[in-house]
């Protein structure tokens, strides 16, 4: 809701904005992914620019790389998303950059920890608990523990910290 976003920014006047909203529920619901991940990012970027925000922290996804050609994935790796989520999060990242506000983009995957109900670990847990089989493809996954993630965020929100894109 663009009006709500603008009102929040104009009333609160943040210096730093952490943009982590995302739609990732139904891979076939391209419209919802677009509304949340693209239009939502546009609303945040515009409101940030209008209201003098000094720094944006944007959560992207490692799915922006599609099927990586090499591991670990270097920042020079081309983006080639092939899912609605990956495509729309990548478009959202571009709108954050278009704002001209110094932006830290984090292309992370699989944050795990207490009360997180999405991702491979909760999925495996639910399947095993109900007696279903689990399957693993020939792939590699990165995992980031929530406590490490929060420690990093304490550092990242400081105005004098680096900007740019990081895996």
Task: Enumerate the language-model features and the residues they cover.
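NAD(P)H-binding glycine-rich loop region in Rossmannoid oxidoreductase-like domains
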Residues: 1-36
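Conserved Rossmann-fold NAD(P)-dependent oxidoreductase catalytic core, especially the SDR/UDP-sugar
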Residues: 19, 42-84, 104
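Conserved catalytic-site region of short-chain dehydrogenase/reductase
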Residues: 25-27, 58-72, 84-90, 111-118
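Conserved active-site region of classical short-chain dehydrogenase/reductase
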Residues: 38-46, 147-150, 154
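Conserved catalytic Lys-bearing alpha helix of Rossmann-like short-chain dehydrogenase/reductases
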Residues: 38-44, 86-96
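NAD(P)-dependent short-chain dehydrogenase/reductase
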Residues: 82, 94-155
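Short-chain dehydrogenase/reductase
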Residues: 109, 165-167
């Amino acid at each position: 809701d663009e009006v709500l976003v603008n009102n929040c920014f104009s009333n609160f006047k943040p210096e730093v904005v952490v943009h982590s909203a995302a739609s990732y529920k139904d891979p076939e619901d391209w419209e919802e992914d677009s509304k949340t991940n693209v239009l939502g990012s546009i609303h945040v970027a515009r409101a940030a620019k209008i209201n003098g925000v000094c720094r944006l922290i944007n959560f992207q996804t490692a799915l922006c790389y599609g099927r990586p050609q090499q591991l670990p994935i270097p920042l020079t790796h081309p983006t080639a998303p092939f899912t609605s989520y990956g495509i729309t999060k990548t478009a959202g990242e571009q709108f954050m950059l278009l704002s001209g506000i110094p932006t830290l983009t984090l292309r992370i995957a699989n944050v795990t920890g207490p009360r997180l109900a999405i991702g491979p670990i909760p999925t495996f847990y639910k399947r095993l608990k109900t007696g279903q089989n689990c399957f693993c493809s020939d792939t590699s996954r990165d995992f980031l523990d929530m406590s490490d993630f929060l420690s990093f965020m304490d550092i990242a929100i400081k105005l004098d910290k680096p900007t740019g894109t990081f895996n």
